[in-house]
């Protein structure tokens, strides 16, 4: 939420945990736009915008390989990229859902839950394909069979711990699965939230993450 406020010039309360989802918009400064505006004198200048969605802390039981579901899943599926913030600072006045501070565990839990959600999506899609193949003529099965082969290959890699973003997929394969709502295919940045007393060890902490 602190990063959300900084990016959107917002003032969302960061003192405690909230189940509320926050959405904010930030304009993207671009000197090129200013140059063009001075040249062509348009009636209106509209800079690019980035919409940020600040999700609440993971729900209770998160990290127990259940996969992400419900509103939490819908919110993550709706964004183009992910920024995961994990806590490394110690402060007894700020509670943690798991009661202990372990940023590596928290990051791994999030990645694991995204993977399990993707596997769940794959299983449901593969089941529909298998059922559909029974109704399709042999000569018409080519495209459906190719999709099945692709999804099985993706699932095998996910089960081996390889996120979709790290799998070697052709551009046409990426287009084929673009509407499925997979989470582990999204670009991802991980940020570790440290305390002032940890500044000297920030590089070592970054390497761990």
Predicted regions and their residues:
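Conserved G1/Walker A P-loop phosphate-binding module
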Residues: 1-95, 103-104, 124, 129-132, ...
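Preference for short coil/turn "hinge" residues that link or interrupt alpha-helices
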Residues: 19-21, 103, 107, 157, ...
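Conserved beta-strand/loop subsegment of P-loop NTPase cores
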Residues: 51-53, 80-87, 103-127, 150-166, ...
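Flexible beta-alpha connector loops of hexameric P-loop NTPases
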Residues: 58-63, 99, 105-114, 137-142, ...
